[in-house]
């Protein structure tokens, strides 16, 4: 990786979108074939809008993953960081249990997690047929959180690459 003529930004974007594209293809298949055809569950909203929101979520989630990778020195340490951070993010985002049943402090802390916004906007699009005019705030917040994690991860990754080249 260090001898390739790529910048840390290009390496990170390739990592995010290579995996993200595979996930988006899987999500599209699951919604069109499994949900609509096999299970006969109608989707109320726009599939392209949902996929665009899912792409933004994948960017945010992958940015958190890369950030955690810059904090850890080994794969076992990274695994422990994932257990301590990603699992609570998923459990407290509103997808497993309603956010309204959580203490206000937890609800406020979870506003720093992109999963919270994605759960809200995915439910709005898929269940209620919401359009961009309804979900844009959640989409902007989710993308902003992802951009913050991406920026910090990029700075840390650049520093790590620079230190290993010296």
For the regions a language model picked out, list residue spans one by one:
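Alpha-helical transmembrane segments of multi-pass membrane proteins
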Residues: 9-26, 49, 141
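Membrane-spanning alpha-helical segments of multipass transporters and channels
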Residues: 21, 32, 41-166
